[in-house]
């Protein structure tokens, strides 16, 4: 066991994490040169295109060090984005060490820090590495100062490398072997294995990626999950060298996979502990928690007959994404669809994109909302994740909205504009620190404000230099109201929004004005109204298209003209009673694009 090293790589988006992983695999000969491709461990197309890692992947590599010994290195690739922070903490708790990759030309950024603190809390040894030192803009001294200043770990002897050219990659492995301790654990103790990740394979069912903490596991033994108590016979165990390879057994300290003919992904929850049925461990490994969705949106098929296809696609996605939740929902305006829960905005975009790309779905998405805690006047508390389910104003005693703590990092030139943005979003400042040229701001902001367009606007006010990460803090009482949109007096449920009272009139007016531009003119007048309860806060009219019925009258008596106009008026009135207004797809997106003033 002294020759095993389990490590993962922590980095901000675009700091070269996946490229470094590729180089390490190449140096260790995990894949032949002809099988090498960029970003070996990012298996989904969408991961490659966006240049992000979503699912955790592993590679078991062997490396002959300069002291002549052969070491087994287990690389566990972690997602870097804030939405997947639970997956990151699971991946990290399976390691003894982490390479902290910092771009020498850009310095430390928000997600690096967030994941790095997670690593330090879990007691993982952090080894700093400066990447991209072949760039003309690289400034390693500055980067080292920032690492020491912001994160507070000694980085004077940080290894310098360039993952792109392969320069210094062996030095990285050497310092990894020197600084990271070998795994502890007893191969003879009762089995405890931590599930780092799980995914669905069409041929063998669920594949679980595990780190064996104690004990030994062989095929044909019976295992059980400690969170659910379900039992399964093991079919195969093995490791990935990115390609899978079956082994006779997995023992303490190793990272590998278990295939046990499990049909549902929900049975193999990330962070759960696997143990033997016969000789069970007395307690599970710490740190398991159920992941709760934070952001909800309605997904509807454009064609009503695609509903079943959408349900099947969601079921298939759920196989590979246990944190996705969905339930059927009916909307008068959009027909049948699903209310889906996501971990965050990026997660939502990815699910939508995968549905459109892998399953060829055409979707309408309603505005994303967060979960509100509503105390009703009879004292009961309900969770509301859909504006349509919000009770009438008279039945509500108090509404609490989720507040998140946001950490922002940016160069000091942009502090002013970022603070202005946070104030607009009803944020309250908690802390502000200067680290050299970088500034760290901490704000508490309602989650609902972040869901809409906070990230995009942060990038635009800081010219792309600011980075952020957020975590849920608490529910806090707030004065929020539901704004309904009425078209000719009928509520359109899919257009309801929940906003803070201070912005409700403005948002109602804006949405009404937007809809006036978007809804095509009808043969009769259409009134668009925004209402809070029974109180109308805004109104826009779409004038009717009309035919000039007087064109054929030439001269003649006024009563003749009056008669024709009256007849037209009657016809329009009749039409208005039977007609219904078609609402185009853009109207639903219009809500998203309303900016706060």
Curated annotation (Swiss-Prot):
InterPro entries: EF-4, EFG_III/V, EFG_V-like, EFTu-like_2, G_TR_CS, LepA_C_sf, LepA_CTD, LepA_IV. It catalyses: GTP + H2O = GDP + phosphate + H(+). It is an enzyme of class 3 (hydrolase). It is found in: Cell inner membrane. SUPFAM superfamilies: EF-G C-terminal domain-like (SSF54980), P-loop containing nucleoside triphosphate hydrolases (SSF52540), Translation proteins (SSF50447). Pfam families: EFG_C, GTP_EFTU, GTP_EFTU_D2, LepA_C. GTP binds at residues 14-19, 131-134. The keyword Cell inner membrane applies. Keywords: Cell inner membrane, Cell membrane, GTP-binding, Hydrolase, Membrane, Nucleotide-binding, Protein biosynthesis. One of its GO terms (biological process) is positive regulation of translation. Transmembrane segments: none annotated. The keyword Cell division does not apply. It is a peripheral membrane protein. GO terms for molecular function: GTP binding; GTPase activity; guanosine tetraphosphate binding; ribosome binding; translation elongation factor activity. Residues 2-184 form the tr-type G domain. Its EC number is 3.6.5.n1. Its main location: membrane. CDD domains: EF4_II, EF4_III, LepA, lepA_C. One of its GO terms (cellular component) is plasma membrane. Belongs to the TRAFAC class translation factor GTPase superfamily. Classic translation factor GTPase family. LepA subfamily. NCBIfam families: lepA, small_GTP. Required for accurate and efficient protein synthesis under certain stress conditions. May act as a fidelity factor of the translation reaction, by catalyzing a one-codon backward translocation of tRNAs on improperly translocated ribosomes. Back-translocation proceeds from a post-translocation (POST) complex to a pre-translocation (PRE) complex, thus giving elongation factor G a second chance to translocate the tRNAs correctly. Binds to ribosomes in a GTP-dependent manner. This is Elongation factor 4.
């Amino acid at each position: 066991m002294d020759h095993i090293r389990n490590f993962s790589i922590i980095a901000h988006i675009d700091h070269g994490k996946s490229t470094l992983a590729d180089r390490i695999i190449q140096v260790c000969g995990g894949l032949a040169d002809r099988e090498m491709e960029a970003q070996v461990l990012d298996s989904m197309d969408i991961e490659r295109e966006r240049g992000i890692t979503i699912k955790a992947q592993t590679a078991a590599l062997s490396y002959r060090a300069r002291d002549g010994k052969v070491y087994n290195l287990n690389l566990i690739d972690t997602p870097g984005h804030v939405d997947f922070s639970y997956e990151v903490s699971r991946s990290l708790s399976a390691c003894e060490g982490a390479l902290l990759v910092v771009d020498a030309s850009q310095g430390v950024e928000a997600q690096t820090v967030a994941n790095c603190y997670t690593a330090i809390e879990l007691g993982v040894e952090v080894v700093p590495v400066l990447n991209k030192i072949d760039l003309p803009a690289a400034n390693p001294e500055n980067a080292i100062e920032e690492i020491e200043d912001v994160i507070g770990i000694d980085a004077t002897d940080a290894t310098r490398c360039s993952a792109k050219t392969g320069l210094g990659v062996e030095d990285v492995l050497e310092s990894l072997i020197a600084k990271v301790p070998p795994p502890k654990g007893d191969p003879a103790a009762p089995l405890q294995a931590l599930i780092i990740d799980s995914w669905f394979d069409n041929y063998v069912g669920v594949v679980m990626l595990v780190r064996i903490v104690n004990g030994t596991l062989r095929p044909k033994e019976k295992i059980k999950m400690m969170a659910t108590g379900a039992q399964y016979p093991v079919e195969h165990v093995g490791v990935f060298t990115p390609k899978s390879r079956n082994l006779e057994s997995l023992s303490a300290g190793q990272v590998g996979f278990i295939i046990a003919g499990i049909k549902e992904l929900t049975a193999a929850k990330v962070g759960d502990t696997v143990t033997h049925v016969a000789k069970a461990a007395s307690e599970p490994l710490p740190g398991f928690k159920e992941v709760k969705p934070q952001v909800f949106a309605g997904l509807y098929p454009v064609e009503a007959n695609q509903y079943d296809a959408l349900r099947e696609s969601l079921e298939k996605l759920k196989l590979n994404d246990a944190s996705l939740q969905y339930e059927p929902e009916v909307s008068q305006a959009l027909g049948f669809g699903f209310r889906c829960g996501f971990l965050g905005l990026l997660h939502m975009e990815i699910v939508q994109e995968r549905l459109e790309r892998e399953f060829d779905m055409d979707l309408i998405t309603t505005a994303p909302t967060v979960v509100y805690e509503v105390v009703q006047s009879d004292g009961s508390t309900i969770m509301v994740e859909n504006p349509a389910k919000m009770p009438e104003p008279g039945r509500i005693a108090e509404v609490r909205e989720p507040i998140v703590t946001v950490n922002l990092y940016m160069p000091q030139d942009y502090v002013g504009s970022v603070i202005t943005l946070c104030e607009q979003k009803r944020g309250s400042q908690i802390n502000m620190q200067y680290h050299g040229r970088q500034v760290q701001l901490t704000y508490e902001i309602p989650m609902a404000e972040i869901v809409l367009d906070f990230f995009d606007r942060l990038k635009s006010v800081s010219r792309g230099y600011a980075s952020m990460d957020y975590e849920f803090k608490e529910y806090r009482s707030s004065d929020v109201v539901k704004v309904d949109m009425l078209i000719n007096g009928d509520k359109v449920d899919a257009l309801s929004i929940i906003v803070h009272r201070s912005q409700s009139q403005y948002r109602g007016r804006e949405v009404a004005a937007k809809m006036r531009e978007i809804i095509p003119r009808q043969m009769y007048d259409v009134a668009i109204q925004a209402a809070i309860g029974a109180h109308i806060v805004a109104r826009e009219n779409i004038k009717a298209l009309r035919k000039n019925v007087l064109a054929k009258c030439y001269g003649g008596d006024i009563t003749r003209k009056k008669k024709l106009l009256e007849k037209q008026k009657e016809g329009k009135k009749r039409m208005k009673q039977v007609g219904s207004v078609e609402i185009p797809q853009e109207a639903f997106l219009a809500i998203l694009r309303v900016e706060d003033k």
